A protein has these predicted regions:
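Outer-membrane beta-barrel proteins
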Residues: 1-311
């Protein structure tokens, strides 16, 4: 990483002599053992991320990013190149994002999930949960601060454009909107979210609220969300995270009451840092009620033990 950083610094110093540009490179890797009853697997993946930014003469920061990823939780394990979909402009407490991968603020009340994607691999999952059909695409977002509050407005003109270079702004048939408000009331953090998705056959809406509070040496989070349209129902969740010595322990619980199903999910996660960007983790997820179809390779209870490294 040190040699890579020095190389990138040398190259960018030569190219951007007059501009106030910055290019940073980071990497990560994960290796784990994953189990779903009798289906036992190894999972190995990693990513390299590039963050690019520059500052105009007026002080506005313009940034973008890209990455190369091999997902440890993907059954296909295909290497992907991501990024260069959005450009971010930030100045004076206001941030504007333009691009083909702008997301609306859905999932605000979903606080019960505390495990990573590897522990969730091959889990049957809750059969139905709150959500909208699609939450990103070609569009823009504007976020600004008012004292201790942050307000965000989101518009997606073409939800079918992600991973493409072009978005169909005037002829798109899939659109989305949203708003998000974050503030503190006393010692309680409050986040409100609203998101919509609409196409020729769907008219989805989702609202959510999340509250956070420092309690008993940790952080307690409580959330609630409701959606109508394709996924009609309510979902509530609670999670608690605390540090014991250097270890971080998180427990989460979610309950979904949908039109045709009802299910619960319980998560437990423990991680311990070893220094130098290396940590070990153990995670477990269990679902009950109306779950996904059980097969020889899936289970209502799954777990993962492994190590994650950041470079």
């Amino acid at each position: 990483m040190k040699k890579l950083s020095l190389l990138v610094s040398a190259i960018t110093a030569g190219i951007f002599t007059t501009a106030q540009a910055d290019i940073s490179v980071s990497g990560s890797s994960t290796i784990a053992y994953q189990s779903a009853d009798s289906n036992n697997n190894s999972a190995h993946g990693g990513a390299v991320s590039f963050a690019l930014s520059t500052t105009t003469d007026s002080g506005m920061t313009v940034s973008s990013g890209a990455g190369i990823t091999l997902s440890a939780s993907s059954t296909g394990a295909a290497r992907t190149v991501s990024g260069f979909q959005n450009i971010t402009f930030a100045t004076g407490g206001t941030t504007v994002v333009l691009g083909n991968d702008v997301g609306v603020p859905d999932g605000v009340g979903d606080v019960g999930g505390v495990v990573g994607d590897i522990a969730a691999l091959n889990n049957n999952g809750m059969s139905s949960t709150v959500g909208i059909t699609d939450d990103e695409g070609t569009g823009m977002s504007l976020t600004t601060t008012f004292g201790s509050a942050t307000v965000g407005l989101y518009y997606v003109a073409d939800s079918a454009s992600t991973s493409k270079a072009l978005g169909d702004i005037d002829g798109a048939t899939e659109t989305g909107t949203g708003a998000k408000f974050t503030t503190t009331v006393g010692d309680v953090g409050v986040t409100l979210g609203y998101a919509t998705y609409e196409d020729s056959s769907a008219d989805d809406e989702e609202t959510g609220i999340a509250l956070t509070y420092a309690a008993m040496g940790g952080t307690l989070s409580v959330g609630y969300e409701n959606s109508t349209g394709t996924n009609d129902g309510n979902q509530a969740g609670v999670s608690y995270a605390m540090t014991l010595d250097a270890a971080t322990v998180s427990i989460g619980f979610s309950s979904a009451d949908m039109t045709a199903s009802s299910s619960t999910q319980t998560d437990v996660a423990v991680s311990y840092p070893l220094g130098g960007g290396v940590s070990v983790f153990a995670e477990m997820r269990s679902v009950s009620g109306d779950t996904g179809t059980d097969t020889s390779s899936t289970s209502n209870s799954t777990m993962a033990i492994g190590s994650s490294i950041t470079f």
